[in-house]
Design a protein with these regions (language model features):
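Non-catalytic terminal extensions that flank enzyme cores
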Residues: 4-13, 17-66
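Short, flexible loop segments at the rims of nucleotide/cofactor-binding pockets, characterized by
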Residues: 37-40, 70-71, 121
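N-terminal catalytic cores of NTP/NDP-binding nucleotidyl/phosphoryl-transfer enzymes
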Residues: 45-106, 208-216, 222
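A glycine- and small-aliphatic-rich helix-loop capping segment at beta-alpha/alpha-beta transitions
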Residues: 78, 112-113, 161
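A general structural detector for well-ordered alpha-helical segments in enzyme core domains, enriched
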Residues: 78-81, 124, 128
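Alpha-helical recognition segments enriched in aromatics with Gly/Pro capping
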Residues: 93-100, 125-140, 145-248
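A charged helix-plus-loop insertion that forms the helical arch/lid used to bind
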Residues: 106-122
Length: 248
């Protein structure tokens, strides 16, 4: 099978994908400078520095929904950042959204995503992990599937989770507001997505969550849910969005 990170994107040099910083001892302040380089937003650098000073490996979450056969070009930026955390001794947690992929992330969408079957998602998930390990150190990566907890929830538990978030909060999302203003429908299951992504952070006790700038709202929901659960809130680290060669 072709390496999807190189032939599919011929303009991307192999050195950009495979060149990583050497694993060398760094002080918390040095780690902060190294890890925040190239990010679009970090909320907050002060909190990240405090976590780095704890002297333990941090749990760094990156979630991907296997909605297509290949990892999106834009994921490589977050994967590279996750690799940087690995090289400093932190725990990379690659969360495969095998459950949320059947819903579809509404972030940045002007219309509802078409639903995927579970079989389609599982086939895609297998290729996603293979491709991710072209960047990540497989031996130092923890892989989790959010279907492991969401499929165990009963309706009472789902209602309890939903009660922690208001409709007003959900409608603060720019993409939802834009669709309302344009008279386009928003399906109720789409409103669930940020809550579910946020709950993922509670389940894996994330110290930091990585994502694109389009994920900012969802990651902030995770902070709120962690606070309600009495957990330390995750640091938000979002990366600039890169378009693929097809412009998406």
């Amino acid at each position: 099978m072709k390496n999807p990170l190189f032939p599919v994107f011929p303009g991307l040099s192999r050195s950009l994908i495979t060149a990583h910083f050497p694993l060398i001892p760094m002080s918390p302040d040095q780690q902060l400078a190294h890890l925040t380089a190239g990010t679009a937003k970090v909320l907050s650098e002060k909190e990240l520095l405090e976590k780095l000073r704890l002297g333990r490996p941090l749990r760094i979450k990156l979630g991907v929904d296997p909605t297509a056969p290949d990892i999106h070009f834009g994921h490589t930026v977050a994967l590279e950042k996750l690799r940087q955390f690995q090289e400093l001794g932190h725990q990379a947690v690659l969360l495969i959204g095998d459950f949320t992929a059947t819903i579809g992330d509404p972030s940045g969408r002007s219309a509802t995503r078409p639903p995927l079957t579970r079989d389609e998602v599982l086939v895609n998930a297998a290729t996603y992990t293979d491709q991710a390990f072209k960047i990540l150190d497989k031996a130092k990566t923890e892989i989790v599937y959010n279907g492991d907890w969401f499929r165990k929830m009963n309706y009472e538990e789902i209602l309890k989770l939903n009660s922690r978030v208001t409709l007003q909060q959900m409608l603060q999302r720019e993409d939802f507001r834009a669709r309302l203003d344009a008279g386009q429908e928003i399906r109720l299951h789409e409103l669930q997505y940020p809550i579910m992504q946020g709950w993922d952070s509670v389940e894996i006790r994330a110290d930091v969550e990585l994502g694109g700038t389009d994920q900012l709202f969802n990651i902030l929901v995770g902070r709120d849910l962690q606070k309600e659960e009495g957990q330390p809130q995750q640091v938000v680290m979002v990366m600039p969005l890169l378009e693929g060669l097809d412009g998406v």
